[in-house]
């Protein structure tokens, strides 16, 4: 079972392994807010119920009860492992790990690096431990895949002591997604991943680019936090750090308020002035809205900077991968990103680029650099690691 616990939500998928076959999936929302929503897929149909879900432990008990009452499983003994998504593993965890009390303590020590996410992930881990104490549980970290980055990639040009004393460095995120699509790309290309130089573009409301050389992440666009890198739905991506005191002075905001603006009111929303949803922006740009068009241009130009930079880092590229909500579904963004990359050996086919939400090659056969659309599947990656470590 793959689990993604948020502060007031719990997403779950039950998979048959090693077939990687989805049995059911669902989400528990509004935990602790008085009007909980429980949604589960039963025989391909969504079943939604509304009732008070006071805490995560209650959510877990309800989930396990529903799995048996809907006859999705006959007995809880069928659950052989639980994989938990954990956002931040810092430098402590460079791979997924079997959860012990020491591991939970290690995750807690990373809380200051991800104050919104890690505590919620721990609550999910503890809730399952309470209800299914004998089922092996595995922590799968968003940051672990990027722990192969060399120091020259992850270090900021700050006093070196800041890194040693406070752990200030680039960590990178979306690692589970980048790992999944890079492995899948190698399968689709029919080549050993050790021989491939891949550019993975995880483009969703949060977005990051990763340079993957020989199956290892050597650089990625997000940084110490997921605020860095390319323009995103509501996040600014990279800005000049001296802007923070300047904005404070001009607007009267505190430092935390400015960070909140950079996280929640910037990006596509900030530039367009009306939406963080790329579908709305594409529609408005098509109707001649200049700010919407500008938002698309800014979004694309930031992605180009990373593609060029990472191609140079790897001395070339064998394939470019598009994944996540925008990468998998936006023909417009893929076209804008790929347009002008012929100098790198990227020749893409506009008719093949019409694909949405499924695996496909969208390059011409003669293109030296292949271009793939691969729907990400972080849950399968979590399940694979759970099987690997729980046996």
Swiss-Prot record:
Substrate binds at residue 85. Mg(2+) binds at residues 4, 378. The keyword Cell membrane does not apply. Mg(2+). Can also accept Mn(2+). The active site is at 142 (proton donor/acceptor). Pathway: Metabolic intermediate biosynthesis; acetyl-CoA biosynthesis; acetyl-CoA from acetate: step 1/2. This is Acetate kinase. It comes from Halalkalibacterium halodurans (strain ATCC BAA-125 / DSM 18197 / FERM 7344 / JCM 9153 / C-125). The lineage of its organism: Bacteria, Bacillati, Bacillota, Bacilli, Bacillales.
């Amino acid at each position: 079972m793959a689990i993604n616990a948020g502060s007031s939500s719990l997403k779950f998928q039950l998979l048959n392994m090693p077939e990687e076959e989805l049995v059911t999936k669902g989400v528990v929302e509004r935990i602790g807010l008085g009007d909980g929503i429980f949604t589960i897929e039963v025989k391909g149909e969504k079943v939604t119920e509304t009732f008070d879900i006071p805490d995560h432990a209650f959510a877990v008990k309800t989930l396990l009860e529903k799995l048996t009452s809907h006859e999705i499983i006959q007995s809880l003994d069928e659950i052989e492992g639980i994989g938990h998504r954990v956002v931040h593993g810092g430098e402590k965890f460079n791979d997924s790990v079997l959860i012990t009390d020491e591991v939970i303590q290690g995750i807690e020590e990373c809380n200051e690096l991800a104050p919104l996410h890690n505590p919620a992930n721990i609550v999910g881990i503890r809730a399952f431990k309470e209800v299914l104490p004998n089922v092996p549980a595995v922590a799968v970290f968003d940051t672990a895949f990027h722990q192969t980055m060399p120091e020259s990639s992850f270090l900021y040009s700050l006093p070196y002591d800041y890194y040693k004393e406070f752990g200030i460095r680039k960590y990178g995120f979306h690692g589970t997604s980048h790992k999944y699509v890079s492995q899948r790309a190698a399968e689709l290309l029919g080549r050993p991943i050790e021989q491939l130089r891949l550019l993975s573009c995880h483009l969703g409301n949060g977005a990051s680019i990763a340079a993957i050389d020989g199956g290892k992440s050597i650089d990625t666009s997000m940084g110490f936090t997921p605020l860095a890198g390319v323009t995103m739905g509501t996040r600014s991506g990279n800005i000049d750090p001296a802007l923070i005191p300047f904005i404070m002075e001009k607007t009267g905001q505190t430092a935390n308020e400015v960070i909140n603006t950079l996280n929640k009111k910037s990006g596509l929303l900030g530039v367009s002035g009306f939406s963080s949803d790329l579908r709305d922006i594409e529609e408005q740009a098509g109707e001649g809205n200049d700010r919407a068009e500008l938002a698309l241009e800014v979004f694309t130009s930031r992605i180009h900077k990373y593609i060029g930079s990472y191609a140079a880092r790897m001395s070339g590229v064998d394939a470019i991968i598009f994944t996540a909500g925008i990468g998998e579904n936006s023909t417009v963004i893929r076209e804008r990103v790929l347009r002008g990359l012929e100098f790198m050996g990227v020749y893409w086919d506009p008719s093949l680029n019409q694909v949405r939400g499924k695996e496909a090659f969208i390059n011409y056969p003669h293109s030296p650099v292949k271009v793939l659309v691969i729907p990400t599947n972080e849950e399968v990656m979590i399940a694979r690691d759970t099987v690997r470590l729980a046996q």
